[in-house]
């Protein structure tokens, strides 16, 4: 309040290696979201250093951060963040549009990602026509379609039943296995 300075993420030091599955846990207000925003290049640290694949992210401008997000990161949001007027396939294609991929390649990648998460037959449905678990799978497909080196997931199973939660975690583990076979990170 007022002149009080709050350090949301202070004295954090971590190294994450290729193929690792890492969870950031802590009490409410402990800086988890701030930490995730910094890791995801949505924010930069006010002090200290953050390196992603050897790049000093803290010194980058907004355009450079956007390029890093687009090239290296996949996001799975807790609230799905699906666009209601777009169908499932178009929702998965959104980050591929920003990546500058041609329409045919976008469509192919998005369709393949939806098949991987078991939604190949729902490609032309709107998000409102899907269950919560199916919407989460669309969010996962969107993150996977760009074949990112790093996937950041904010409580990806928080609103799901235990069976769907296990399936979602299994999908993420498979992607980690795929990513660790590549020489990108």
Give, region by region, the residue ranges found by the protein language model.
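ABC family nucleotide-binding domain
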Residues: 1-182
């Amino acid at each position: 309040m007022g002149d009080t300075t709050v350090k949301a993420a202070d004295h954090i030091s971590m190294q994450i290696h290729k193929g690792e599955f890492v969870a950031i846990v802590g009490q409410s207000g402990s800086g988890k979201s701030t930490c995730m925003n910094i890791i995801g290049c949505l924010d930069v640290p006010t002090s200290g250093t953050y390196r992603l694949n050897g790049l000093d992210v803290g010194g980058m401008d907004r355009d450079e951060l956007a390029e890093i997000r687009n090239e290296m990161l996949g996001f799975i949001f807790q609230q799905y963040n699906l666009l209601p007027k777009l169908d499932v396939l178009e929702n998965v294609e959104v980050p591929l549009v920003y990546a500058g991929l041609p329409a045919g390649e976008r469509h192919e990648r998005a369709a393949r990602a939806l098949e991987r998460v078991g939604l190949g037959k729902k490609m032309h449905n709107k998000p409102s026509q899907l269950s919560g678990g199916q919407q989460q799978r669309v969010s996962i497909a969107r993150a996977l379609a760009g074949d990112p080196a790093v996937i950041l997931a904010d409580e990806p199973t928080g609103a799901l039943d235990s069976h769907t939660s296990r399936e979602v975690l299994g999908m993420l583990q498979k992607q980690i296995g795929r990513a660790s076979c590549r020489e990108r990170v």
